[in-house]
């Protein structure tokens, strides 16, 4: 196992992800992790991440000096390398020769860390300070146009000024793999088949004959959680699906069919009427979210009580992922609220359940791989993200049954055409928004004054930033023609070309 000490870089999670993609398990801890906890984890090597600070700043982030007493291989990346240089007596300075973006790395000295790596390759830079003078005993391994010491080494200690974890660094994955395998002596033992077997055994032991309640949203995370639990504890799992009437077209039927194929009993609650009645007259986005969250809890509580009367429920399952865990102990300090599944926050006190989070060690891409290992269909696993409040936040203004039907039909057409054109898997997320505005149109010889629909499609890797998708005009024209001809009440279609930032992916 490789342990990554997080100094606040926006790329820290990528380090662990790249290593895991190579079959090497990696964990992330804050830079101030105690030496006792580091020793308990028994890593075979340490990676010091990048960070936004300068090593010579008064409040510069610094780990325990005792990490050097562990006699472990260490790799410093960007700030991590500069910290190593400063700690061992070298010179780091702020110059006018900052580097951001792509640069050419040229290897000047053979090293095990560069085994099988091209002499010249593209790398990703993001630094203002640079190493001016190496500490005694260190050797320069590579350079870039603005960094004479772009990679350094001293026995088992290495430094890289660039970010190997970023996809733009052509040989970055290989370099990280070399450090883990050739320097640290790790083995490729990490994978979803191994994880599934290990986690099911752990769940069986922990839960024994107790009952577990699991809220199913129809999304990937909750479906994978339910499937993993059912494999481990069979009918002691109580899976609950609340249909709030704000789902995509045919969504309920798809979820029910999926769970039937997986042979998992699913308790479906039809709560459409109560949700719509509580949303009547409400236009403000945050109030809509609040009402949906509270109403979900009421519906979930009612169903949970039924099962609780039949036999005490001891556990509640949630789809917490590893990024949520990392954020809760980041270098910014523990979060005030640990992010949880939108459906299960704020449960009443009588639901005094023990928490089970089977996916808390996994990144989103690993959850999909686990789902595949568990036999969940690829089409389902690769579906675009869908918000917890559903179509309520894609209908601007008040929500009504007629608006929901209108949006469902338009959205169905957009997604259907994306799939026909083999574009669905090429965009990160795509959907329609029903705008709270009417416009004048002409249908035949008649004047119309009807709703406008906005098409939204974005490219992203994790949703933190996104750019709008460049869809061909002919494709957009086809979608527009179908929507205006097939969906009653729509006479205008527009395409959103806003990136994030400055906009958000969802409109509300």
UniProtKB/Swiss-Prot annotation:
Which superkingdom does the taxonomy of this entry point to? Bacteria
Q: What positions does the domain GMPS ATP-PPase occupy?
A: 190-383
User: Taking every annotated instance into account, which residue ranges of this chain make up the domain Glutamine amidotransferase type-1?
Assistant: 1-189
Q: What class of enzyme is it?
A: ligase
Recorded metabolic or biological pathway in which this protein acts: Purine metabolism; GMP biosynthesis; GMP from XMP (L-Gln route): step 1/1
**What residues make up the catalytic site?**
78, 163, 165
**GO MF annotations in UniProt:** ATP binding; GMP synthase activity
Reactions catalysed, semicolon-separated, are: XMP + L-glutamine + ATP + H2O = GMP + L-glutamate + AMP + diphosphate + 2 H(+)
Please provide, in alphabetical order, the Gene Ontology terms of the cellular component aspect for this entry: cytosol
Q: Where does ATP bind?
A: 217-223
Q: Which UniProt keywords apply?
A: ATP-binding, Glutamine amidotransferase, GMP biosynthesis, Ligase, Nucleotide-binding, Purine biosynthesis
Q: Which InterPro entries match?
A: Class_I_gatase-like, GATASE, GMP_synth_C, GMP_synth_GATase, GMP_synthase, GMPS_ATP_PPase_dom, NAD/GMP_synthase, Rossmann-like_a/b/a_fold
Enzyme Commission numbers on file: 6.3.5.2
The record's listing under CDD domains reads: GATase1_GMP_Synthase, GMP_synthase_C
Which Pfam family, giving just one, matches this sequence? GATase
Q: How does it assemble?
A: Homodimer.
The free-text function statement in the UniProt record for this protein reads: Catalyzes the synthesis of GMP from XMP.
- Name of the featured protein: GMP synthase [glutamine-hydrolyzing]
Supply the source organism for this entry: Helicobacter pylori (strain Shi470)
Its encoding gene is what?
guaA
